[in-house]
Amino acid sequence: MTYLKNQIDPDETLMEEKVLKYIKQFSIMSSLEQLREVVRNLADTFNNPNVRESSYFDFYDDSLNIHGFPPNLPSNKEGFKQFIYLLWKAFPDIRIIFEDIIIEGNKVVCRYYLTGTHKGDFEDLQPTGRLFNVNGMTEFSFRNEKIIERWNLVDMVSLREQLTTHA
């Protein structure tokens, strides 16, 4: 079969389409893996008292909008910082452990548990020295690998029960 000078070989076109499809899939997988790595680094930073105060909030964009945190705090990055500092003070050894990470587009949903020891004031509770372990879920929205929105749900009833119930 002869082809004219500018005519495209159908086999070459098919191969180019396959390559472009592969590149697109690889790019999508790469960006999903990048977000997974960002979230893992976020948890590692949150869990490390030696670096968290200097690095944790770098994962969040200045335009951050938060949901599911105490209503008396602003729903922006400053309000979020206030709440996290309160957590770190009340539970200096607090750790977050992600059990599931689900990613779609620019959103990451994490199912996790928090664990720690109550060593400082938390809401109306004086330090009890008690250990706690509570479940939670968070949805992050990203732009340029920075978190721009965060929805949070933590089992605060269980936390309160664990801190106040007498053994």
Residue ranges and their predicted role:
Residues 2-167:
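C-terminal and inter-domain tail/linker signature
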